[in-house]
Amino acid sequence: MISALLGRSKSELEEWAVAQGQPAFRGRQLHDWLYAKGVRDLQGITVLPKAWRASLQNEGVSVGRLHEQERRVSADATTKLLLGTEDGETLETVGIPTDQRLTVCVSSQVGCPMACRFCATGKGGLQRSLAGHEIVAQVLSIREVMERRPSHVVFMGMGEPLLNIEAVLESIRCLNDDLGIGQRRITVSTVGVPHTLPRLADLALKQLGRAQFTLAVSLHAPNQALREELIPTAKTYPYDALLDDCRYYLNKTGRRVSFEYILLGGVNDHPHHASELADRVGGFQSHVNLIAYNPIEEEEFQRPTTQRIEGFRRVLERRGVAVSLRASRGLDQDAACGQLRRNRRS
C-alpha cells in the first residue's frame, strides 16, 4: 500500500488504480491532477468517485504535498519558502526567477550532516533524508506560489544529495517524465562523499537510462589542508581521490563536471588560491562556478570584496579555466541555504 501518490509515474498510478479495483483511466486522472493541476489533497480530485476518495483517506493515503509555513520574497523576486512535512519537520526551497527562466533550489534532506563551517544548514545537524515525493513537492510549491512553470531545478538546498541517492534519482525521474523538466536543466550538487560519485553514475544509467543532469562538485578550497578546515568531512576524502571519482563520472556518463567554489573573504580568495585551483582542475573537462559568500548571523566569514572576486576570476581565465560568477540573489531575505529555518528555530 502506498501512502503518498506524488512521485508516482503514470503507469504506476494506472497499475495501482487497477489493484484498487478501479479502471486504469482513474490512474491517468490521478496523474493529471497531481502534476498538471497541482492538487493538494484527495478531496480536491473531484473526478474520482467520492466513496473511493473517502476510502483512500481512511487508509492513510495522501497526495503528499508539503505545507507552507513561511514565505520571504526579496526585492529581486527571489522567493524562499519554509515548508512543513507530514511528520512535523521543516525544510527550505527557493524560487529564483529571471526573465527567461525559473530555477527551483530544492533540499534533499532535513538538515545536513556535513557541517561545512560556512553553511547555516550544517549548524543544526541532520534530522532525516527526504523521500522522492517530498523533493518533487518543493517544485510544485514554488510553481504554485510564483504562478510560473519551473524551467530548472538545482539540488543545492539543505542536505547532501549523495547521502540520499535513491530518492534524488526518483525525484529526477519524476521531474523529467511527469513535470517535463529536462535532465539537462537539473543540477545535483555535492560536497563529496567517498565512493558515491561512481555509484551515482552507475545508478543513474541503470535507473534513468541516461545521466544527462549536471554534476556540481563543491571544492571551496584549492588544497587538501584548507578544504579540511572548511569541510570537516573532507578528512575522509582526499582531494586526489575526489578528482579521480569525478573523472570516473565524466568517463561513465560523458557529462562535464562543474566545480563550485565559494569565495570567503580573506580565507580562500587570494590570487595564489586561484592559481593553485587552476593547477588542480586545469585540463579537466569541467567548468568552475564562483560563488561569493552570503553572510549568515554569528559567523566568522565575510563576503569578499568585488576586487578580490574579479581578481580571482581573471587568474582562472588567464590559465584557460572555464569560469563563471554566480549572481547573488535574495540577500535581503535570508535566501542562503538553511538561514530561514535556522532563524525560525532560534
From Swiss-Prot:
Pfam families: Radical_SAM (PF04055), RlmN_N (PF21016)
Domain Radical SAM core: 98-332
Subcellular location: Cytoplasm
InterPro entries documented for this protein: Aldolase_TIM, Methyltransferase_A, RlmN_N, RNA_MTrfase_RlmN, rRNA_lsu_MTrfase_RlmN/Cfr, rSAM
GO biological process: rRNA base methylation; tRNA methylation
SUPFAM superfamilies: Radical SAM enzymes (SSF102114)
Positions of S-adenosyl-L-methionine binding: G159, E160, S189, S218, L219, H220, N294
Annotated keywords: 4Fe-4S, Cytoplasm, Disulfide bond, Iron, Iron-sulfur, Metal-binding, Methyltransferase, rRNA processing, S-adenosyl-L-methionine, Transferase, tRNA processing
Cofactor, free-text remark: Binds 1 [4Fe-4S] cluster. The cluster is coordinated with 3 cysteines and an exchangeable S-adenosyl-L-methionine.
Record EC number: 2.1.1.192
Gene Ontology cellular-component terms listed: cytoplasm
Family listed: Belongs to the radical SAM superfamily. RlmN family.
Role summary: Specifically methylates position 2 of adenine 2503 in 23S rRNA and position 2 of adenine 37 in tRNAs.
Further remark: Reaction proceeds by a ping-pong mechanism involving intermediate methylation of a conserved cysteine residue.
Protein name: Probable dual-specificity RNA methyltransferase RlmN
UniProt organism field: Synechococcus sp. (strain CC9311)
